[in-house]
Amino acid sequence: MTSPEPERPEWLDTLTEALSEQSRLDQVVALRPGVGARPAAVLILIGDGPDGPEIMFVERAAGMRTHAGQIAFPGGAADLADHDLADTALREAAEETGVDRTGIDVLGVLPPAYVEVSGFDVTAVLAWWRKPSPVAVMDSREAASIDIVPVTVLTDPAHRARVRHPSGYTGPAFEVNGHLIWGLTAHLLDGVLDLAGWQRPWDRSRVVPIPVRYLTDRRPDHGGPDAH
């Protein structure tokens, strides 16, 4: 006998409803709207863990041309063979982490956000990890580790801060497991937490430095996909 399909948890309801409100989606990328550049996509994969919702991240390999060593959502540039940007995000996630895409349900997409350092319009694809599968680094040239982080950890006020780039860029950040999530990844994550109703109050006056090892790109748009 096959096991029954898991029911979608109630904590996804608010996010699912928000994904039908275009004005709210536009707000997430209002500070960096798409410009018609080369398309790319990232997968914001939400699973049901022991402590409630959790999200998958990839630590990018130290040798990557851009965003080296940083925490990002799995993703990359669109291929001509992709049916759409959701297909791009699922394909890239499978290539990077080995996740079984047949156990993933796409919930919706955000409008594209422009990443100047890589020249991509990046579309975030939100998905429910209906049937979790094993994940691991598939190519050490692209990723150093796969991290699945509970939303309770991401929203802990002790882990929230803002960063200020030498260029003047300021934005949200998350301090998790010894890493700093910032740039586009933190921007999208912060927006998704708002859409889902998962945010908790935090000290927005707290500013933390960006590690020097993260300041190797020309522009302050770190945390997004590179051209694979």
Q: How does the language model describe each region?
A:
Residues 1-72, 77-95, 99-133, 164, ...:
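N-terminal leader/linker segments that precede catalytic domains of diphosphate-processing enzymes
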Residues 138-175:
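NUDIX/MutT-family hydrolases
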